[in-house]
From Swiss-Prot:
Keywords: Bacterial flagellum. This is Flagellar hook-basal body complex protein FliE. It is found in: Bacterial flagellum basal body. InterPro entries: FliE. GO terms for biological process: bacterial-type flagellum-dependent cell motility. HAMAP family: FliE. GO terms for cellular component: bacterial-type flagellum basal body. GO terms for molecular function: cytoskeletal motor activity; structural molecule activity. Belongs to the FliE family. It comes from Halalkalibacterium halodurans (strain ATCC BAA-125 / DSM 18197 / FERM 7344 / JCM 9153 / C-125) (Bacillus halodurans).
């Protein structure tokens, strides 16, 4: 089975607190953000896949631990919900910036 990895905020916090942030060019900062965002989305996808695999194995009778399957499913659900909320906040912030007059 694949090991479950969680999406954590410290990756972003450590980058924001380091003094090397000021040394990045805008292109490097975009690439760093792109990599962090891509990694977070991949982690959400991995959780969804593990949940689907365990659910399928439970349905086939190969796993008898319903408790583990339910916990895995809830972790995937909560992570996806948090990701959707973050996306909504990013879109809201973008729309607010676009409404600003220059």
């Amino acid at each position: 089975m694949a090991e479950i990895q969680t999406v954590t905020a410290p990756v972003f916090l450590n980058q924001a607190n380091s003094s090397s942030v000021n040394k990045h060019t805008p292109a490097e900062a975009q690439e760093t953000f792109k990599q962090a965002l891509s990694q977070a989305i991949n982690n959400v996808n991995d959780l969804q896949k593990v949940s689907a695999e365990k659910t399928e194995l439970l349905a086939k009778g190969k796993i008898e631990d319903l408790h583990d399957v339910m916990i895995t499913g809830q972790k995937a659900s909560i992570t996806l919900s948090a990701t959707v909320e973050i996306r909504n906040k990013v879109i809201e912030a973008y729309q607010e910036i676009m409404r600003m007059q220059v």
